[in-house]
């Protein structure tokens, strides 16, 4: 188990009926969240640069929210949020596990940024949504080449 579980972009913008990801992914993400103590779960929400700050972002329907540790980002990598970086550093974090969406975009960028920040990084594919499976082979190759621990299989 990593020091922290980062749940990336599991929000209604991406995970809902009619979207690329739906209930099956939410159930898998919830199963993973349940394996961590609540104080070790961090949620990352994406806010597009054009969105108003006073518009509250909504988690995916039925997502298990066990922590008030919620950080927003407006770029692909969650490490563009200095508050997240300060929180992780201030808590002596050594290892991070990632789940969420999309494996080729925000999860990918966050994983690679975490490696550059010198964290031990793991990804549980059973709780990662990937819209483009073919492109994901390149992502996996890159993660392996950077020493990321990859476990589980995509849904």
Residue ranges and their predicted role:
Residues 62-71, 131-155:
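Structural recognition of alpha->loop->beta junctions
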Residues 75, 102, 154-155:
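Short beta->alpha linker loops
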Residues 77-81:
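S-adenosyl-L-methionine/SAH cofactor-binding core of RNA-modifying enzymes
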Residues 1-75, 85-86, 90-94, 148-149:
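Active-site acidic carboxylates
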Residues 18-22, 99-104:
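Short, glycine-rich nucleotide/cofactor-binding loops
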Residues 53-57, 108, 137-140:
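Short, surface-exposed alpha-helical segments at coil->helix boundaries
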Residues 28-36, 105-116:
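Histidine-anchored nucleotide/phosphate-binding helix
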Residues 97-100, 118-133:
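A short glycine-rich beta-strand->turn/loop micro-motif centered on a GG-aromatic cluster
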